[in-house]
Amino acid sequence: MIDRLEKIQEKYLRISEELNQAKDPSSLKNLYKERSRLTPLYLKVEEYLKIYKDRKDAEELIQSEKDEEMHSMLKEEIREANLKLETLEREFEILLLPPDPNSGKNILVEIRAGTGGEEAGLFVADLFRMYSKFADKQKIKTEIIDSSPTGIGGLKEIIFALEDDRAYDLFKFEGGTHRVQRIPSTESGGRIHTSAVTVAVLPEADEEEVQINESDLRIDVYRSSGAGGQHVNTTDSAVRITHIPTGVVVACQDEKSQHKNKAKALRILSARILEKQAEDKKQASDAIKKQMIGSGDRSERVRTYNFPQGRCTDHRIGFTSHNLSAIMEGDLDELIGALTEEDRVRKISETQTH
């Protein structure tokens, strides 16, 4: 344990030294990110090593101490040190877990209507509102990238960006199928309808992670259309980009400017290519899947929102809240906290069995 902690200490100090000498912006960014990730661990290591040294000194002194009062004080000092070291060792179980490679990234969140017709479209809008309110409470910037309104206040699809180094860690468990059970306002018989929407959480790609060559793209432009299919723009401002090597297709029509739509489409394209690369890696490694709370796949049913009963259930961890109204207002802290804790427990268990 001590050897491992001293190596972490050395690594942190080496990165700090490299930061003082680095001039390349890309290197500086990576070094700052790595040091920021290591800082909480480094501070705990410093604390642990100091207590460990103090305990060792006390153990040496107690061997030759003849005074009863002093002997008793040293014994108590050793006991307290042992308790502190045990607490820190439990914290290290979490801090020493391998970092998620996507932690610290900005993300794109994509919500699409699934089964359920107009009700599904309305719930897409409800989920976007829920996520926006949660992001606002966390002081995270939200930017709509593209959306397709239904004309009755719903959305066929919406893609939005969340820009903050906490965004991925807070939203990474949202991917999958979200099911809603409620009585539509148009339902005169009071029957409960079930509909579903899918959520995808896409980490934004760094330039070095996804390099897109212009020659690999087919770019089509067309007139954007609004709810019901009517054309809302008389110029060809909407953009569809096909990445020929992967077959990934992205369309964007939210902006009136073709240039802005192209820039947004390229942003989505980069994230989707990164997602495809991650999926390919997942298929090659079952071990990664076992470490996750669910797969994050669009087809996996992750949560049910039952409005008549005021209940929200996350099926992956058996979490149930009977305060659905608060959740829909963006009060997601308890739910996300439970998912994060369960993920930590599973990862710790996984490391202990290897």
UniProtKB/Swiss-Prot annotation:
GO molecular function terms noted in the UniProt entry: translation release factor activity, codon specific
Alphabetical UniProt keywords: Cytoplasm, Methylation, Protein biosynthesis
PROSITE patterns noted in UniProt: RF_PROK_I (PS00745)
Cell location: Cytoplasm
Transmembrane segments: none
UniProt GO cellular component terms: cytoplasm
Pfam families the UniProt entry points to: PCRF, RF-1
Keyword hit for S-adenosyl-L-methionine: no
Superkingdom of source: Bacteria
PTM statement from Swiss-Prot or TrEMBL: Methylated by PrmC. Methylation increases the termination efficiency of RF1.
Entry keyword annotation includes Protein biosynthesis: yes
Modified residues (N5-methylglutamine): 230
Functional description taken from the UniProt entry: Peptide chain release factor 1 directs the termination of translation in response to the peptide chain termination codons UAG and UAA.
UniProt similarity note: Belongs to the prokaryotic/mitochondrial release factor family.
PANTHER family recorded: LD18447P (PTHR43804:SF7)
Protein name: Peptide chain release factor 1
Taxonomic lineage of the native organism: Bacteria, Pseudomonadati, Spirochaetota, Spirochaetia, Leptospirales
Gene that produces this protein: prfA
